[in-house]
Amino acid sequence: MPAWARYALVLAATAVFVVFAYHARYAKIDEFTGFRMEEMTRLIAGVLAALYALTVAVELHIGRKLNVGAQALLCVVVGLILLAKVSLFDYVSDDYDIFLSNWIYEYSQMGIKQGLGTYIGSDYTPPYLYLLLLISRVKNYPWQYLVKAVSMAFEVLLAYAVTQLAGLQVRGAGKRVVIFNLTLMLPTVVFNGAYWGQCDVIYTSLA
């Protein structure tokens, strides 16, 4: 499939996914009344659509030698994987409830410059704290969704890295996309990011 056709497929598949994401139901959404419900839903759908587009684009790049039907099927598979993970978004882990949410709230009370220079009692490395600082700029929003979305974005990088490493021994686009999808579905990956909202995948993907 030529590159322009892959891009068109990514756009078309993302448009379909946005419809599903927009009409999904999120248990925590009623707790945030700063935005109108429609605005909140659009924001959530936008975040999920960006995740979907990233994942599909990377997977179609890996499977670029597959036929059109196979690539269209990959778009469906990615959508199902992502929707399954989204179903875990409303779970609030103790770590998020006790630590992450409070750190983000503290940052939300500061400006960017002040936040960069303030120690908030965290033992996380500065780059991750900078991500939390950026998340805190989004007011009246379910921050846990963004925390989990960040981890899920790095899951794509992890899956790509694993696929590239496996590609040293495994030949064939079909096998490589299977490895990519299996990595995204590993229990440790799913629970660490979409369920617990942990950031272990970030440094793992960059290792």
Residue ranges of predicted features:
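Start-transfer (signal-anchor) and selected internal transmembrane alpha helices
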Residues: 1-86, 164-171, 176-178
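Hydrophobic transmembrane-helix microenvironments that flank and shape a buried ionizable site
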Residues: 82, 125, 148, 152, ...
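Interfacial juxtamembrane loops and adjacent helix segments
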Residues: 116-148
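Transmembrane-helix motifs of polytopic, lipid-linked glycan transferases
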Residues: 149-170
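Membrane-embedded helix bundles of polyisoprenyl
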Residues: 176-206
